[in-house]
Amino acid sequence: MQTPRLYRVILPVADIERATAFYGVVFGTPGQRISPGRHYFNCGGIIFACYDPEADGDGEQGGWRLHPLQYLYFAVPDLEDTLARVQTAGGIIVADIDTMPWGERLFYARDPFGSPVCFVDERTLFTG
């Protein structure tokens, strides 16, 4: 059996316009508006979807809560440039660039909605 391929990750957001602006600056691409409350960014063949249920007419879905350590990890070619983009776009740096014991160079941040995100130097990815 072939291993399933991850193709989309959905991040609930409270304001689709702010999310689009933030991730557009951080990723350096405008992405694509799919519906009033969905905006997609192609991240190396995997869709990163910002989803605002209110803007999409879905209302309160209830029950889902973000765990503070539930990070989304993005591999990037230039860690320092990405850190600057996150700051410029209004993100909060939680932990500055550091090297983990397993060799990854990365930094932790929060987007404007408090969602935890991590950016890893693509040359140092540890995949097990």
Each PLM stretch: what is its role?
Residues 116-119:
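Short glycine-/small-residue motifs
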Residues 19-24, 86, 114:
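Conserved active-site tyrosine of GNAT-family acetyltransferases
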Residues 1-7, 28-75, 81-110, 121-128:
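Vicinal oxygen chelate
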